[in-house]
Structure formats: structure tokens, C-alpha cells
Amino acid sequence: MPAIAILTGASSGIGAAAAQQFMDRGDTVINISRRDCPVAGVETIGTDLGDAKSLASTCAALSERLGSQPDGPVCLVHNASLMLKDRCDVTSDEDLERVLAVNVVG
């Protein structure tokens, strides 16, 4: 039975490769990201994973898209992440909070 795969950060790299694998299996793939996924057939819900209001809007869009009883199993792959280029001792609190918001909270 085809699954519904929800991936964060499928706009490039490992996330896009994972999206391609799910698509190759015949699954429905939804990308949660600020940018579109380059894989044909992947639906994108534009989201800033570090922003609470954006996440709330995304949850509403997913609920509307999937309904109360999705057809098939649902898989969530939280792949999105941010990486700082500066050393920890020169990283601002705001930058660290942004990384935690995307990598952990989002």
C-alpha cells in the first residue's frame, strides 16, 4: 500500500534524495520547506520551520490536505536542519535560537 511521506527539508541534498526514493516506491510525498523540492511530483507546503506561526499554518494545511483519515500509512522524516559556520564562542544567542528552532522544535 502506498504511503504518504511527509519530509522536512526535501528541497535539496539528502532530503531530495529521500523524496526521490519515496516517489520511486509510488508514495505520495509532501515537502515541508521554504523551497520547492526538485523531484517531479512532490508537493511542497512552504514553511519556515523556525517560526511558530508558520508551523501552525503548516499543520492546518496538512490537516486539510490529508483529512481525518489519510489513505495509507503516514511517514514523517524530519530532515531539515541549519548549521552555523561560526565557532560557538562567537555565535549570537539569536543564531543559536534559530538553529534550535529549526533543528529541534520545528
Language-model features and meaning:
Residues 4-7, 73-77:
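Conserved hydrophobic beta-strands of the Rossmann-like cofactor-binding core
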Residues 11, 19:
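N-terminal Rossmann NAD(P)H-binding glycine-rich loop of SDR-like oxidoreductase domains
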Residues 25-39:
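Conserved glycine-rich Rossmann-like NAD(P)H-binding loop of the short-chain dehydrogenase/reductase
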Residues 40-53:
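Rossmann-fold cofactor-recognition segment
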Residues 50-67:
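Conserved Rossmann-fold cofactor-binding substructure of NAD(P)-dependent oxidoreductases
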Residues 79-84:
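Conserved NAD(P)H cofactor-binding loop of Rossmann-fold oxidoreductase domains
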Residues 87-88, 92-97:
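Substrate-binding pocket helix/loop in short-chain dehydrogenase/reductase
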